[in-house]
């Protein structure tokens, strides 16, 4: 059985990095400059949130290189901010072969947005050229404790 990691912990982000580095092998990333950031509010204190109670991870593609780190960028092409507790069940949910789960996730995020617990800032199409990200969610879901 694969090791599981706490959502957005250092080991979880390290796994995301390992996955994305592998998925990007052979991709032509020349000329692509993209930053993507997921930020989680009201994070558990043992995950070392910032003064505002936030943790996050980001992806930067620049000069043909993929960088994945834990942290919050001052500015990204697309930033998704969501309440940690709200997103946690979705972070564990595999969507492939699970259309009901995908619908549930969309409904949960719409409800969270309406309640002010989720927002998207920037260009929603920012990561469209990054086809190697396609399997990231499910790979992480299978490893999220």
Model-based region annotation:
Residues 1-145:
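Feature captures hydrophobic
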């Amino acid at each position: 059985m694969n090791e599981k990691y706490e959502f957005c912990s250092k080991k979880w982000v390290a796994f995301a990095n390992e996955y994305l580095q592998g998925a990007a092998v052979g991709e032509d990333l020349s000329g692509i400059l993209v930053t993507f950031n997921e930020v989680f509010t009201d994070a558990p204190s043992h995950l070392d949130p910032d003064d505002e109670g936030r943790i996050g991870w980001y992806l930067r593609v620049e000069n043909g290189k993929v960088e994945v780190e834990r942290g919050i960028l001052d500015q990204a092409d697309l930033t998704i901010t969501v309440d940690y507790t709200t997103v946690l069940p979705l972070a564990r949910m595999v969507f492939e072969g699970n259309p009901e789960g995908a619908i549930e996730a969309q409904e949960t995020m719409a409800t969270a947005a309406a309640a002010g617990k989720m927002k998207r800032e920037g260009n929603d199409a920012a990561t469209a050229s990054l086809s190697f990200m396609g399997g990231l969610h499910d790979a992480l879901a299978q490893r999220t404790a």
